[in-house]
């Protein structure tokens, strides 16, 4: 007779292989951080946006693991604010034309200021050897393909009255993954619109029957889904 103790189901579900991307952020800390970021942005008339952005990116990195290693966002708002003011001025003097370059540059700044958290060595394996000459995180996406993909995603969402949002989101996530490299390895995204569609309908239904309360859980779950459908090639 087998006398080994039964293992809890939860432990089985939480087991993550070293090759996985994992995200463990929850709704409470997400909305707490988001509220603070919104207050900073609103009360500074947008000038404090870099500080708000850093708050959100630090929260996301703190809850993200790649191949067992925890991420860390190493940028400061002061490192972005000069560029942010410059981009705003260039957008004004070009009558909005320069704005097409702002979002891809912010995305690049966010990705290239990520690193693996060296203080978590007790839980995280050491970085792979032989890659010290390769930037840990690199992004090479440009404005043309960013806005082309964004326009297609927008049209897909609008012409389906929002029902095809999961397919639009997947378009954008695949584009981002295609242009992101970690220690020289390209990120791949294997999520599909159909794979998210069922969850999306369920979340909308739960939001409806809870009179909007469930909506607080949707964004963190979208982030988790987006992160955990990535891998390194």
Sequence positions of predicted segments:
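Membrane-interface extramembranous regions at the lipid-water interface
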Residues: 2-36, 52-85, 102-152, 168-201, ...
């Amino acid at each position: 007779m087998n006398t080994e103790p039964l293992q809890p189901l939860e432990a089985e579900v939480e087991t993550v292989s070293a090759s996985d991307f994992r995200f463990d952020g929850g709704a409470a800390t997400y909305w707490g951080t988001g509220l603070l970021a919104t207050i900073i942005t609103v009360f500074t008339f947008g000038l404090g946006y870099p500080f708000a952005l850093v708050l959100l990116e630090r929260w996301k990195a703190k809850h993200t693991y790649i191949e067992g290693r925890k991420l860390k966002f190493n940028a400061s708002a002061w490192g972005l604010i000069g560029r942010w003011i410059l981009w705003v001025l260039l957008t004004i003097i070009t009558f909005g034309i320069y704005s097409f370059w702002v979002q891809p540059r912010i995305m690049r700044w966010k990705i290239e200021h990520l690193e693996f958290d060296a203080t978590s060595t007790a839980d995280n394996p050491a970085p792979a050897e032989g890659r010290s000459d390769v930037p840990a995180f690199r992004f090479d996406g440009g404005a043309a393909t960013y806005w082309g993909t964004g326009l297609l995603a927008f049209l897909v969402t609008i012409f389906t009255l929002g029902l095809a949002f999961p397919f639009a989101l997947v378009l954008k996530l695949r584009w981002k993954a295609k242009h992101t490299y970690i220690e020289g390895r390209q990120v791949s995204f294997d999520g599909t619109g159909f794979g998210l569609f069922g969850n999306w309908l369920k979340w909308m239904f739960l939001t409806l029957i809870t009179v909007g309360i469930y909506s607080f859980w949707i964004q963190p779950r979208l982030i988790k889904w987006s992160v955990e459908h990535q891998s390194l090639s």
